Swiss-Prot record:
Gene3D superfamilies: Ribosomal protein L10e/L16. Belongs to the universal ribosomal protein uL16 family. GO terms for biological process: translation. InterPro entries: Ribosomal_uL16, Ribosomal_uL16_bact-type, Ribosomal_uL16_CS, Ribosomal_uL16_dom, Ribosomal_uL16_sf. This is Large ribosomal subunit protein uL16. Keywords: Ribonucleoprotein, Ribosomal protein, RNA-binding, rRNA-binding, tRNA-binding. It comes from the Bacteria. HAMAP family: Ribosomal_uL16. Part of the 50S ribosomal subunit. GO terms for molecular function: rRNA binding; structural constituent of ribosome; tRNA binding. GO terms for cellular component: cytosolic large ribosomal subunit. Binds 23S rRNA and is also seen to make contacts with the A and possibly P site tRNAs.
Length: 144
């Protein structure tokens, strides 16, 4: 699973998720990409589940690029603990993904295989997505 090797601060502020992604809005490496159409935190487990779903469907053929990395820690308090007494312990790692960001890219497989692999990956993620091709940035929407 993806986790940072070393961080300066273990506990981070939550931050805001306003606006669109500043960069990473075009397909850069592969032929097909999975683009987020809404903003959300994506955990390292969700990224790994999507990666496994894609590679299994492609039968280890082609190449997959993961364009997001979970660099932000999130905390939670134990169940039954009252309010106050400081911030909770680090629980896991997330990648804040804004609207328009390309999360995964695929190359080296036929169009039908790429579309189905990205569709399967989109069901593992908590955001609405669309499948985009390298040339035209229109795309097929997956509201679900």
């Amino acid at each position: 699973m993806l986790v940072p090797k070393r961080v300066k601060h273990r506990r981070e502020f939550r931050g805001k998720m306003r606006g669109e992604a500043k960069g990473g809005k075009e397909v850069a490496f592969g032929e097909w990409g999975l683009q987020a159409t809404e903003s959300h935190w994506i955990t390292n487990r969700q990224i790994e589940a999507a990666r496994i779903a894609m590679t299994r469907y492609m039968k280890r053929g082609g190449k997959v690029w993961i364009k997001i990395f979970p660099h932000k820690s999130y905390t939670s308090k134990a169940i039954g603990v009252r309010m106050g007494k400081g911030k909770g312990a680090p629980e896991g790692w997330v990648s804040p993904v804004k609207r328009g960001k390309i999360m995964f890219e695929i190359a080296g497989v036929p169009e039908e295989v790429a579309r189905e692999a990205l569709r399967l990956a989109s069901h593992k993620l908590p955001v609405k997505t669309k499948i985009v091709k390298r040339e035209e940035m229109g795309g097929e929407s997956n509201e679900g």
